[in-house]
Design a protein with these regions (language model features):
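Partner-binding and oligomerization surfaces adjacent to conserved cores of proteins
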Residues: 1-187
Length: 187
């Protein structure tokens, strides 16, 4: 007798404004999400750490290079976080895209929320730095995907491949706009 074990895919959520139609269509048509470089992240305390002069400078160099050569795609574990709808989905006039990540080359990190910044040690990696956020952001329930190292970020903008399961529209999306998006998506 065979055991039929079914593994459900992990579903994550990308909150989006609908103001940039081209970006929305890129996501829906190409099944890809954009990543941002560290310097493009919206939290001014993003990626901070406490440096100790006892730590070899090569560790510090590796962290700085890692910040500048990897893209970050931020997703959430939940689709019903009010502040996420407000901050990232244009005050409920946007959408939340439910996705299953299909990329095999991006690294998954569960974000850890802390009251203090990371202390740099000999074993600290870029992943250790980029997976930590201030505890005030804990409501986001964030999962991050890090791209492979990109040698020339001026010429390359890698995207995270996903399978879209559904699109949830905010309650403030006007019915006419919703119907247009529905036609586009089902075409």
């Amino acid at each position: 007798m065979k055991n039929n074990i079914s593994i459900e895919p992990e579903l994550l959520y990308k909150y989006r404004s609908l103001e940039n139609l081209e970006r929305f269509l890129d996501i829906v048509i190409d099944n890809k999400l954009y990543g941002a470089l560290y310097k493009e992240m919206n939290d001014p305390m993003e990626g901070y750490f406490q440096y100790s002069p006892d730590v070899d400078k090569s560790v510090l160099t590796g962290i700085w290079e890692g910040k500048n050569k990897r893209y970050i795609c931020s997703l959430s574990k939940k689709s019903n976080i009010g502040l996420m709808w407000t901050h990232y989905a244009n005050e409920n006039k946007g959408c939340c895209i439910e996705v299953e990540v299909t990329s095999k080359t991006w690294e998954r990190l569960d974000v850890e929320y802390k009251k203090t910044i990371t202390n740099l040690s000999e074993t600290t990696t870029i992943e250790d730095i980029l997976k930590v956020k201030a505890s005030m952001w804990e409501y986001e329930q964030e999962v991050r995907y890090l791209s492979p190292v990109i040698a020339n970020t001026k010429k390359s903008n890698p995207q995270l491949t996903v399978r879209i399961h559904r699109i949830i529209f905010g309650y403030k999306v006007k019915i006419k706009k919703y119907n247009r998006f529905k036609k586009i998506i089902s075409a």
